[in-house]
Amino acid sequence: MSILNFNKLIDHTNLKANATYEEIERLCHEAIEYGFFSVCVNPAYIRTAKKILLKSPVKVCTVVDFPLGQTFSEQKVYEAKTSIKMGADEIDMVINIPELINGCACVIDEIRQVKKVCGEKILKVIVETALLNEEQIRKATLACIDGGADFIKTSTGFSTRGASLNDIKIMQQASQNKILIKASGGISTARELIEFVKVGADRIGTSRSVKLMQELKTMDLAK
């Protein structure tokens, strides 16, 4: 892959609680300009993003029960269903972390319920690796596979740390290529982006997408 093609792996993200209409509008226009795979926005901005991106190939991604994952499964199903009706192409849902750590089968059932309403739309399950040990990351990966998720995602970006290369390696080894992997949170340089893709990340979530692409372009020109 040419380093300039990394744009197609990026979910260009703004999930700030105080994100303004102007910031989301700029996010969408940047995604069009740089050819990012999607924009990832809070549900309140789905319609805004969809309207701006309507004639472009850029997808609209949103979040469910973000960033804590602590609401009822029924509420997560409702949020996902409503988000898709509003125009979301992809759903990033936060799992119930304590139940995941406790090994509750309800986690798998919750993923299945949300995936059912997603249908052919993409479901990514956020497991917040900062709060898990290595064995729990392995179990989380298997739970996402059993629940029928399309992706397992490392982080919300709101916890004690974002993605690590070791997180991706563990997920890759545990999954045996049965699920895609999204790395998000804290990826701030082009070299980090390249390393995450090398170890197995299929998608990258970042708010620094434009900076990364500019760095990648410089690296490409320096060859």
From Swiss-Prot:
Catalysed reaction, written as an equation: 2-deoxy-D-ribose 5-phosphate = D-glyceraldehyde 3-phosphate + acetaldehyde
UniProt-annotated catalytic positions: 92, 153, 182
Gene Ontology molecular function, alphabetical: deoxyribose-phosphate aldolase activity
Cystine residue pairs: none
UniProt-listed Enzyme Commission number(s): 4.1.2.4
Pathway(s) where this gene product acts: Carbohydrate degradation; 2-deoxy-D-ribose 1-phosphate degradation; D-glyceraldehyde 3-phosphate and acetaldehyde from 2-deoxy-alpha-D-ribose 1-phosphate: step 2/2
Protein's UniProt keywords contain NADP: no
Location within or outside the cell: Cytoplasm
Alphabetical list of SMART domains matching this protein: DeoC
Pfam families: DeoC
Example of a GO cellular component annotation carried by this entry: cytoplasm
Keywords, alphabetical: Cytoplasm, Lyase, Schiff base
Classification via InterPro entries: Aldolase_TIM, DeoC, DeoC/FbaB/LacD_aldolase, DeoC_typeI
Main location: cytoplasm
GO biological process, one term: 2-deoxyribose 1-phosphate catabolic process
Function: Catalyzes a reversible aldol reaction between acetaldehyde and D-glyceraldehyde 3-phosphate to generate 2-deoxy-D-ribose 5-phosphate.
PANTHER family: DEOXYRIBOSE-PHOSPHATE ALDOLASE (PTHR10889:SF1)
Similarity-based family: Belongs to the DeoC/FbaB aldolase family. DeoC type 1 subfamily.
Entry protein name: Deoxyribose-phosphate aldolase
Organismal lineage: Bacteria, Bacillati, Mycoplasmatota, Mycoplasmoidales, Mycoplasmoidaceae
